[in-house]
UniProtKB/Swiss-Prot annotation:
InterPro entries: Crust_neurhormone_CS, Crust_neurohorm, Crust_neurohorm_sf, Hyperglycemic, Hyperglycemic1
Gene3D superfamilies linked: Crustacean CHH/MIH/GIH neurohormone
Source organism phylogeny: Eukaryota, Metazoa, Ecdysozoa, Arthropoda, Crustacea
Tissue-level expression: Produced by the medulla terminalis X-organ in the eyestalks and transported to the sinus gland where they are stored and released.
Organism per entry: Penaeus japonicus
Disulphide bridges, residue numbers: 7-43, 23-39, 26-52
Entry protein name: Crustacean hyperglycemic hormone 6
Annotated localization: Secreted
Amino acid sequence: LVFDPSCAGVYDRVLLGKLNRLCDDCYNVFREPNVATECRSNCFYNLAFVQCLEYLLPPSLHEEYQANVQMV
């Protein structure tokens, strides 16, 4: 897991791994070269991450993932 200097919050390998996995899954679904990179940009605080979240996970988990982004 590569540390992203744009992440100014808590360095938590478990949280970062969870957020990274969502971006990887999103790339695996769409197979667009920039999806994973865009999803991780600005420490996951971006539209691509939100779109991946909405596409891949049930609404009941959206708030939890958004809270995780705020923590890292």
